[in-house]
Regions:
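C-terminal substrate-binding/catalytic lobe of Rossmann-fold NAD(P)-dependent dehydrogenases
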Residues: 108, 113-117, 125-177
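N-terminal Rossmann-like NAD(P) cofactor-binding subdomain of oxidoreductases
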Residues: 1-128, 132-135
Length: 177
């Protein structure tokens, strides 16, 4: 009871599972679940498949670009998913924002080359005070600076619109919020 929010009279459980292979969702009455992984700890098929070893999990959806798994953006390539797929990625927020527009432009006019720029809240990889960092720009105090950095958005677009990624460059500006 202490591990749940009651929403519209139904419990939504917070189930701690440090080792996904040992998680037992059936103990909470959960069977054939779609597990949504936004932990950041698992990013490829091998790691994400650990969730499928837990009791009660049928499919896994990653909320970031994944390696070795289909990266799906609704309105772009959702028809590529088959019912037999058990692990898929919903790509990234940037990929979901730009891919539908790029698909329409590319399909109707073609794209020779382009640049993607995303403005994003600073992340936990940045320092809160000016400090050393392997990527010197990220060493700037996150809450006080706009930091230009790289993003994998161009490569991620290529996973849902094949051939387009080689035509795109991309960068991100991490900003205080």
């Amino acid at each position: 009871e202490n591990l749940a929010l009651i929403i519209n009279g139904r419990p939504v459980y917070f189930i701690p599972a440090p080792d996904p292979t040992k998680a037992d969702y059936t103990a909470y009455g959960i069977n054939k679940a779609l597990l949504i992984d936004n932990s950041g700890a698992f990013r490829d098929e091998t790691a994400l498949s650990k969730h499928l070893q837990g009791k009660g999990v049928d499919k896994v959806l990653l909320t970031a670009p994944g390696k070795g798994i289909p990266n799906i953006v609704h309105g772009v390539n959702q028809s590529d998913v088959t019912k037999s797929e058990r692990i898929i990625s919903a790509a990234s927020c940037t990929t979901n924002a730009i891919s539908p527009v790029l698909k329409v432009v590319n399909d109707h006019f073609g794209i020779e080359r382009g640049h993607l720029e995303t403005i994003h809240a600073y992340t936990n990889d940045q320092n809160l005070v000016d400090n050393m960092h392997s990527k010197y720009r990220r060493g700037r105090a996150a809450a006080m600076n706009m930091v230009i950095t790289e993003t994998g958005a161009g490569k991620a677009v290529d996973k849902c619109i094949p051939g387009l990624g080689q035509k795109l460059t991309s960068s991100a500006i991490r900003v205080p919020v």
